[in-house]
Curated annotation (Swiss-Prot):
Organism: Rickettsia prowazekii (strain Madrid E)
Top-level division of the source organism's lineage: Bacteria
Pfam assignment, any one: PQQ_2
Name the UniProt record assigns to this protein: Uncharacterized protein RP232
Gene3D superfamilies: YVTN repeat-like/Quinoprotein amine dehydrogenase
Length: 415
């Protein structure tokens, strides 16, 4: 018995003896290559992006509970109403003024099942909903009455989008893009790539750009499809990147976070350790740089800001891809053993004194606030504890800032 026990413990004994024991085990923060500054260029947080009226005390405001269970998608704000989708496939309409759920409707026949993915589109007084199943369901936004539903060929994990007044687009996990009539849900056109087999990667919500819709597949493809008939305008594949080979159906061939775009360009972080800039009209690569494990990106002022798993925030020149600013997002006192965490997309806030700052929120309840002065963006942020598990933020139609966890919604002051 003792011999058997010794044999079972042998691998652990060897590990502890060869310098690979607990003191040397590295996590994703240690393993992610760090970015370094490459150019000394100014950073402007100017007004070509949304500027949010923000101070940290907003996060102490009243909390609303608009969902019956844990939310799995970003809330939708229409007037006084908040529409939410929860893990049990309940869609709820919550009145802010009355501080209560006005109606709630369960989308699934399996009420005890948990769902992930999907989202809500509000379009022409209706709610188009996907919830991590094969169904697209349409409800009347005012009453919650089900109008129509359609079963698609496979599971849908991203929210529907409107291509125009009469066309809704959905995308399945098996790389099928389907355009549907917004009234009848009849298929108008579809496009299909190789079915994904193995992937845990981020799924990009399609982007409508001029007469095209930009879609990505987990086979490592980015395509521009004509919104009227689904014709392929251009097709870019990650296998075209010059020093890597992307393997279809594996995460190295996929995107890591929400891409960002302006009127002419698309920026995509890939599992190949590449950040690429594509021309939206042609699909051609304008530049590519080495940048591993990117969590989030944002075009702000004259910079492309990225956050990676090394707990760094960096500012890049969007024209060249060169790094002009890097700062650490460290909170723990023992910086030698930083834990991995999730960061939201950076945003610019302006306080009551009209002072602008760059802000980064982590889901573990830390705000990193970078001030800017005549010398540029400061390297060392103010670090402030806030509520945990903030997943979304943005502006409502009345320009009120909101923050949302998976349970609560908090509102800031108006502009």
């Amino acid at each position: 018995m003792k011999k058997k026990l010794a044999l079972l413990l042998l691998p652990f004994i060897l590990i502890s003896c060869n310098g690979l024991g607990s003191k040397s085990v590295k996590n994703i923060v240690d393993l992610t290559p760090k970015l370094v500054i490459q150019t000394n260029e100014p950073i402007y947080l100017d007004s070509n992006t949304k500027i949010y009226p923000f101070n940290v005390n907003m996060l102490k405001n009243k909390q609303y509970s608009p969902a019956k269970s844990k939310m799995i998608a970003e809330p939708v704000f229409i007037g006084d109403m908040i529409y939410t989708l929860d893990i049990r496939a309940n869609i709820s309409a919550f009145s802010i003024e009355k501080n209560k759920i006005i109606w709630s409707y369960n989308l699934s026949k399996h009420k005890k099942d948990n769902y992930i993915g999907g989202g809500i589109l509000h379009h022409n007084g209706k709610l188009y909903i996907t919830y991590g199943a094969r169904l697209l369901i349409v409800l009347d936004a005012k009453s919650g009455y089900e109008i129509i539903r359609k079963e698609l060929p496979d599971i849908i994990r991203i929210k529907p989008i409107a291509l125009n007044d009469h066309t809704i687009l959905v995308q399945t996990i098996s790389n099928q893009t389907i355009a549907l009539d917004s009234e009848t849900l009849k298929t108008l056109w579809d496009h299909e790539s190789i079915a994904e087999i193995l992937s845990t990667s981020y799924s990009m919500i399609p982007i409508v750009q001029h007469d095209n819709v930009i879609v990505t597949y987990n086979t490592g493809q980015v395509l521009a499809l004509n919104i009227k008939n689904g014709e392929v305008k251009w097709n870019f594949e990650f296998t075209n990147l010059n020093d890597h080979t992307a393997i279809p159906n594996f995460d190295t061939s996929s995107i890591l976070c929400t891409p960002v775009h302006d009127s002419m360009n698309l920026y995509i972080a890939t599992g190949l350790g590449k950040l690429i800039k594509l021309n939206l009209l042609t699909g051609s690569v304008l530049w590519q740089i080495n940048a591993d494990d990117i969590q989030s990106m944002s075009l702000i002022g004259n910079s492309l800001f990225i956050i990676n798993n090394a707990r760094q925030i960096a500012a890049l020149n969007p024209e060249t891809g060169k790094v002009k600013f890097v700062a650490d997002l460290n909170y723990e006192k023992n910086d030698k053993r930083l834990k991995s965490t999730t960061f939201l997309v950076p945003f610019v806030g302006v306080d009551n004194n009209n002072q602008r700052s760059l802000n980064v929120i982590s889901v573990d309840g830390i705000l990193y606030n970078f001030n800017i002065d005549s010398n540029g963006l400061k390297m060392n942020p103010h670090i402030i504890k806030i509520i945990k598990n903030i997943r979304y933020y943005g502006l409502r139609s009345n320009n009120t800032l909101y923050f949302s966890t998976d349970r609560q919604v908090i509102f800031g002051s108006q502009i």
